[in-house]
Amino acid sequence: MSRVAKAPVNIPAGVQVSLNGQLLTVKGKNSELSRTIHNSVEVKEDNGALTFAPREGFAGADAQAGTARALVNAMVIGVTEGFTKKLQLVGVGYRAQVKGNSISLNLGFSHPVEHTLPAGITAECPSQTEIVLKGADKQLIGQVAADIRAYRKPEPYKGKGVRYADEVVRTKEAKKK
């Protein structure tokens, strides 16, 4: 069994977990998340904790058990605390503005780019060059952040573009004469 799957997922107070076949639903004060667990993984709830074990006769069941445990742990953290992802806009005239359920980005194109946020994700702009994404679903936040970054990735010579707040952009030296 994988080392990750051996550790149980503790369920904090105020979080309800329901298991219906292979469909696991986690409800918390912030939101509710559901996920279908792979058939090769057996999930048990006892004493306020979820345990994951591989089923016999499935190839790769050990790996699936570890993956399922990590995904469910992220769900529990998401419904209790939530996740945040910060983006920075680097470049002259690069700006972001939140308009209801979408973000308007000025990224040097001839037109502003409108990015509609999916349900469950909120955005705020503490300054014109910063975007903070918040939500309960870790995978969805990462996907939205990657989609926004893909509009204008950091270029390697000046570092202009949309980058994650903790990202270090390696810059190249300019061509010498």
From Swiss-Prot:
GO terms for molecular function: rRNA binding; structural constituent of ribosome. It comes from Actinobacillus succinogenes (strain ATCC 55618 / DSM 22257 / CCUG 43843 / 130Z). The keyword Ligase does not apply. This protein binds to the 23S rRNA, and is important in its secondary structure. It is located near the subunit interface in the base of the L7/L12 stalk, and near the tRNA binding site of the peptidyltransferase center. It comes from the Bacteria. InterPro entries: Ribosomal_uL6-like (IPR000702), Ribosomal_uL6-like_a/b-dom_sf (IPR036789), Ribosomal_uL6_a/b-dom (IPR020040), Ribosomal_uL6_bac-type (IPR019906), Ribosomal_uL6_CS (IPR002358). Coiled coil: none annotated. This is Large ribosomal subunit protein uL6. GO terms for biological process: cytoplasmic translation. Belongs to the universal ribosomal protein uL6 family. Keywords: Ribonucleoprotein, Ribosomal protein, RNA-binding, rRNA-binding. It holds the Pfam family Ribosomal_L6. GO terms for cellular component: cytosolic large ribosomal subunit. PANTHER family: 60S/50S RIBOSOMAL PROTEIN L6/L9, LARGE RIBOSOMAL SUBUNIT PROTEIN UL6M. Part of the 50S ribosomal subunit. HAMAP family: Ribosomal_uL6_B (MF_01365_B).
